[in-house]
């Protein structure tokens, strides 16, 4: 590049400005959803509801008043360790079978799973308390799994945290011997468990 003729890049360098921009408001987790919404001009304190509502919008799920939307990742836990946040980037087709199975076994009038893309899905709960401490799996690869379970931030959120943790643990039992995961493991791939 040193000897290339780059008149347009040269002009950009001559007229351009550099600097830093704070894209994450104080008190917000520095995730991509927060930064992207801030860059797009959203007033985070008044509109941010978490990743779940964005996931719902991206797959066309219309949320009703009183529903709580949560991002639902298919992850890989090996032993007691969160091996990876994406189940080895599971295909959407494989994931759809697993999400349908979870819906059949764990879904109800108050709990519904929706298929998204690859490992990224949606869980909608009627009611519930959003004041929860949820650790994004991509932030903690190779960490012990159990300490990462959902914790209530206030006593009123205990019931919601307990429900979500129960869904997580039951899903592990359901998915461990699912044909999709057995096939993935036979092929040397990580299971979505």
Model-derived features with residue positions:
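Active-site nucleophile/metal-coordination loop of metallo-enzymes that catalyze phosphate/sulfate
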Residues: 1-106
């Amino acid at each position: 590049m040193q000897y290339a003729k780059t008149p347009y890049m040269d002009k950009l360098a001559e007229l351009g400005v550099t600097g830093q921009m704070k894209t994450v408001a104080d008190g917000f987790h520095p995730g991509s959803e927060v930064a992207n919404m801030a860059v797009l001009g959203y007033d985070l304190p008044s509109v941010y509801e978490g990743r779940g509502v964005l996931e719902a919008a991206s797959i066309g799920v219309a949320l009703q008043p009183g529903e709580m939307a949560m991002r639902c990742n298919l992850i890989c836990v090996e032993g007691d360790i969160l091996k990876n946040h994406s189940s080895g980037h599971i295909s959407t087709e494989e994931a759809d079978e697993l999400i349908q199975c979870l819906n059949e076994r764990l879904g109800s009038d108050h709990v519904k799973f929706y298929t998204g893309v690859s490992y990224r899905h949606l869980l909608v709960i009627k009611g519930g308390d959003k004041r929860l401490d949820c650790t994004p799996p991509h932030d903690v690869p190779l960490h012990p799994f159990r300490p990462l379970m959902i914790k209530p931030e206030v006593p009123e959120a205990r019931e919601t945290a307990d429900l979500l943790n129960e869904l997580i643990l039951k899903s592990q039992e359901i998915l461990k011997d699912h044909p999709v995961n057995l096939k993935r493991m036979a092929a040397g791939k990580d299971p979505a468990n």
